[in-house]
Design a protein with these regions (language model features):
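N-terminal secretory signal peptides
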Residues: 1-53
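C-terminal segment of N-terminal export signals and the immediately downstream linker at the start
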Residues: 45-53, 73-110
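Mid-to-C-terminal alpha-helical segments outside catalytic/metal-binding sites
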Residues: 53-73, 91-95, 104, 120, ...
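Hydrophobic faces of well-ordered beta-strands that scaffold small-molecule active sites
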Residues: 106-110, 163-165, 199-203, 227-229, ...
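Active-site beta-loop-alpha junctions enriched in small/polar residues
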Residues: 111, 168, 204-208, 232, ...
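Acidic (Asp/Glu)-rich catalytic clusters
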Residues: 152-159, 180-196, 216-224, 256-260, ...
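Active-site gating/metal-coordination segments in enzymes
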Residues: 170-288
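Catalytic pocket-lining loop regions of alpha/beta-barrel enzymes
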Residues: 241-387, 413-415, 421
Length: 447
């Protein structure tokens, strides 16, 4: 299949962080989102006139992006570092952009699907994201999640320097996002376009499926940069083939092959279940927990286990009850379990990846998002957190990059739970998360 034909696309910078969803419904954070939207429109009308911009031009500018964070601060409290001058003066905004231009960004989770991919439900994520990303307004089409748009949104419309292309299996082979051969081809195609290694690729392994060990051998020949596995069998809906990381009989022989092949980074989708997971995945949801990570990591210290989505239990906007529990106890379902693994099992080869868990919480419940980061950093160490965006499901990752650069740790959470400050946009901690930690598991290219 040829998924590399190019189209000319427009490239506006995401600016408007919130937008009402279909029929005005935006889930459990509706009131806050509407307040942010109203404040942003008010700010834009105040600030755009001296700049001789219409509303759309302003919201798609760097000043508009700064105004969006000011609007969020007005609703959620001072959770994002933003100078009001950035929203009023293009030179102030440009100066900040120049200062951060050299910051390295390594996104360890990106996606697209092959052209004939039959399911359209994945477009629902882009429909969700259009609440905060204006580039996604209007009808979403299958082409939006194909290679052309992937390359444009990740490498041209954002400051992402390096990325990892991943995939997901399905019991129906036609519904894999990409097969392993496609992943390898995409890596080489991007290298041809850029003249250097800019895209890394996974190979998916599927314990328990007929012929899966033979497929693993074939994948080794493709020389993937890392492995990707789904212990629930497939991300949505029940699979015939769930499995556990610590299954000595089924999975440990595969680890042996991985180790001998010298491909020792094992990425595992955990959590991110649908809200009705106990019904929709009644027989398999328990395999999405992180209770099998510690033993496998202890038994295989030669391997690095990267837990994608940080194991967060569900993938939706954080609900009031989840936020209440966190504020009272510091617990975040399954994320806290993951954060306890290094101390509980005495391991240092477990990492937390931020794809989707950051995207969904940063702009809908930023204080809770800070709590997720604080929990992971405290339990796992600041050298074990990896930047991932799950793009192109949410459009260009630039808005996520800006959100992490600006996100702050509330002082009361630092006192109550012992969380550390997140530091400045280009401070040591955020530089580690954005790229330096990834170098431990994905060697940087020499050119």
């Amino acid at each position: 299949m040829d998924f590399f034909s190019q189209k000319k696309q427009s490239t506006p910078l995401p600016a408007r962080i919130y937008q009402e969803g279909e029929n005005g419904a935006v889930g459990q954070r509706t009131r806050e989102m509407r307040l942010v939207k109203d404040r942003l429109l008010e700010l834009s009308d105040q600030l755009r006139a001296p700049l001789a911009m219409n509303r759309r031009q302003f919201l798609q500018s760097s000043c508009g992006l700064a105004a969006a964070f000011l609007a969020m601060n007005s609703v959620f409290g001072p959770l994002f570092a933003v100078n009001p001058a950035e929203a009023a003066d293009p030179e102030e905004s440009a100066a900040r952009n120049r200062f951060l231009k050299e910051q390295l960004i390594f996104d360890v989770q990106t996606h697209f699907v092959y052209p004939d991919y039959p399911a359209t439900n994945i477009l629902g994520l882009r429909r969700l994201a259009k609440r905060w990303n204006p580039d996604l307004q209007g009808r979403q089409t299958p082409e939006d999640i194909h290679f052309d748009n992937f390359y444009r949104e990740v490498f041209l419309e954002s400051e992402t320097d390096l990325a990892v292309l991943s995939s997901a299996p399905n019991d129906d082979p036609e519904q894999w996002f990409l097969h392993n051969e496609d992943l390898a081809r995409a890596r080489e195609k991007v290298k041809e376009k850029s003249g250097k290694k800019q895209l890394y690729s996974h190979a998916v392994f599927t314990p328990g499926r007929p012929g899966w060990m033979d497929d693993l051998e074939k994948a080794i020949a493709l020389r993937p940069d890392a492995w990707k596995g789904y212990t629930v069998g497939q991300p949505i809906g029940e699979s015939q083939w769930p499995w556990r990381l610590d299954d000595e009989k089924l999975v440990y022989p595969a680890y042996e092959k991985m180790m001998k092949a010298g491909i020792t980074t094992v990425c595992i989708h955990k959590g991110l279940l649908p809200s009705n997971y106990k019904k929709r995945m009644a027989g398999t949801w328990k395999y999405g927990r992180v209770d099998d990570v510690g033993q496998a990591a202890r038994d295989w210290p030669q391997l690095n286990f990267l837990i994608y989505h940080s194991g967060i239990r569900t993938g939706g906007v954080p609900g009031r009850e989840e936020i209440r529990i966190f504020e009272e106890s510091g617990e975040i379902a399954w994320v806290s379990d993951l954060a306890r693994i290094p101390e509980k099992f005495g391991v240092d080869n477990v990492y937390a990846e931020l794809g989707s868990v950051f995207a969904v919480s940063a702009v809908s419940a930023p204080r809770y998002c800070s709590g997720i980061l604080g929990t992971l950093i405290k339990g796992m160490g600041e050298d074990k957190i990896l930047w991932g965006t799950d793009s192109v499901w949410y459009g260009s990752p630039q808005w996520q990059i800006e959100a992490l650069r600006r996100l702050k740790m509330p002082e009361d959470l630092q006192r109550k739970f012992g969380f550390q400050s997140l530091g400045s946009a280009s401070g040591n901690l955020k530089n580690r998360i954005f790229a330096e930690n990834a170098q431990q598991v994905y060697p940087f290219p020499s050119i």
